[in-house]
Regions:
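PLP-dependent amino-acid enzyme catalytic core
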Residues: 1-356
Length: 356
């Protein structure tokens, strides 16, 4: 059996990477597509509901799919450094792939506004972390200005190679199911991922590898929902830090994906997002970060209203692992922590008192 070596090797003929380049990979991709068994019973709906668990990529998020291609191309073109603005996941991924490549990484993050797990990832991988007194959108503006003056390669999703890598998730979904889903539900922040998935679905459809295309359903947090407002949001705020973005860089292509697929954008409150995160963990054992849960929360609400009809095949993207932001999960958990004496009798009594 040939070992899996990463998505560039797996899909090289569909990616803008020539045969002679040095591939910068951490064996990203090939993430599980998990059928939810218990939640459909809880909501009492006839639905085939799956989650694409991108939190099992090397740095714990979907960003690795695009980063392997972006950093591979940067190194091939002679770049000695990469730069990004980030709400956390991009910085973690850029730092790891830059370390793998042996080049520098500069990451701009909003001071005090990203989860510590993500900050730790960037720091331990050796990135130069610049904490700016501003939000992601201010950081993105600065990254563009710096890249116009300094010899650094931007690895945010405005880098077209990022989306080329991220489209492979759609390939994997079709290969796992033997078809495209009826609906694909996905969290939306900077909007590169909904754009990339639509690219991937269209490519397989064009080449006869799928007979249908899904409707793309993008979900934003209410405090950071420019697609719902119809304009950018200057001061986005949400507990779902990964989608706390008011000026999406992929605005136009995401709108196009929405229109072409006859899908929709919708918004969820922070309370709805956290409830979906908790439901996934408690009922299915799948732990994702809050932003990821927006896809499931949105899908469940649309199933309840029959906007997504009964009998549908639905895939929800879980963009990042729950360990990215454990503090929020601990604060909202209903699990009891019981202090007991270190004796058999005390432990046995605690177990019997808490049996379901």
């Amino acid at each position: 059996m040939t070992p899996y070596t990463g998505l560039i090797d797996r899909y090289r003929q569909r990616l803008p990477v020539s045969g002679a380049v040095r591939i910068i990979s951490l064996c990203e991709g090939n993430t599980p597509l998990i059928r939810l068994q218990n939640i459909p019973e809880v909501i009492e709906r006839d639905v085939r509901l799956y989650v694409k668990y991108e939190g099992l990529n090397p740095t714990g998020s979907f960003k690795d799919r695009g980063m392997t291609v972006a950093v591979t191309k940067a190194v091939d073109e002679g770049s000695r450094a990469v730069i990004c603005a980030s709400t956390g996941n991009t910085s973690a991924s850029a730092a790891a792939y830059a370390a793998r490549a042996g080049i520098a990484a500069f990451v701009l993050i909003p001071e005090g506004k990203i989860a510590l797990g993500k900050l730790a990832q960037a720091m331990v991988a050796g990135a130069i972390v610049l904490q700016i007194r501003g939000n992601f959108d201010a950081g993105m503006r600065l990254v563009k200005e710096v890249a116009a003056r300094a010899p650094v390669t931007i690895v945010n999703s405005i880098n077209p190679y990022r989306l080329q890598g991220q489209k492979t998730a759609a390939f994997e979904i079709i290969e796992a199911l033997g078809r495209a889903p009826d609906f694909h539900c996905i969290p939306v922040g900077n909007a590169g991922n909904i754009t990339a998935h639509w690219m991937g679905y269209k490519e397989f459809f064009r080449d006869g590898l799928a007979k249908t295309l899904p409707r793309m359903c993008g979900y934003q947090a209410s405090g950071a929902a420019p697609f719902l407002r119809g304009h950018t949001v200057d001061d986005p705020e949400t507990v779902a830090t990964a989608i706390r973005i008011g000026h999406p860089q992929s605005w136009d292509p995401a709108r196009q994906a929405n229109k072409e697929s006859q899908g929709w954008f919708d918004e969820l409150s922070d309370e709805e997002i956290l409830a979906a995160q908790k439901l996934l963990a408690e009922r299915e054992g799948v732990f994702c970060e809050p932003a990821s849960a927006a896809s499931v929360g949105g899908a469940l609400r649309d199933l309840a209203s029959a906007k997504i009809p009964a009998g549908s095949l639905v895939v929800c993207t879980l963009t990042g692992h729950g360990l990215k932001d454990p503090d929020i999960a601990i604060r909202q958990s209903s699990a009891r922590r019981v202090a007991v004496d270190a004796t058999l009798a005390a432990v046995e009594r605690a177990i019997m008192d808490n049996m379901v």
